[in-house]
From Swiss-Prot:
GO terms for biological process: translation. Keywords: Ribonucleoprotein, Ribosomal protein. GO terms for cellular component: cytosolic large ribosomal subunit. Pfam families: Ribosomal_L29. The gene is rpmC. It comes from Xanthomonas oryzae pv. oryzae (strain KACC10331 / KXO85). This is Large ribosomal subunit protein uL29. The lineage of its organism: Bacteria, Pseudomonadati, Pseudomonadota, Gammaproteobacteria, Lysobacterales.
Length: 61
């Protein structure tokens, strides 16, 4: 998701999105450990999106 789209969301929506991203990150990590992850770039994308959401949550306080 683009940073502009994230800025339009409320803090509660960002927290919910962060929870979903962390679940996705855990799932991707488990797939990577078991050797079942065909698209390894997805872990990087999720990690960066988590950083974007955390940045926005920190700046709104």
């Amino acid at each position: 998701m683009d940073i502009k789209q994230l800025r339009e969301k409320s803090a509660d929506e960002l927290k919910a999105h962060l929870t979903d991203l962390r679940k996705e990150q855990f799932s991707l990590r488990m797939q990577q450990v078991t050797g079942q992850l065909p698209k390894t770039h997805e872990t990087r994308r999720v990690r960066r999106e988590i950083a974007r959401v955390k940045h926005l949550l920190g700046s709104t306080k």
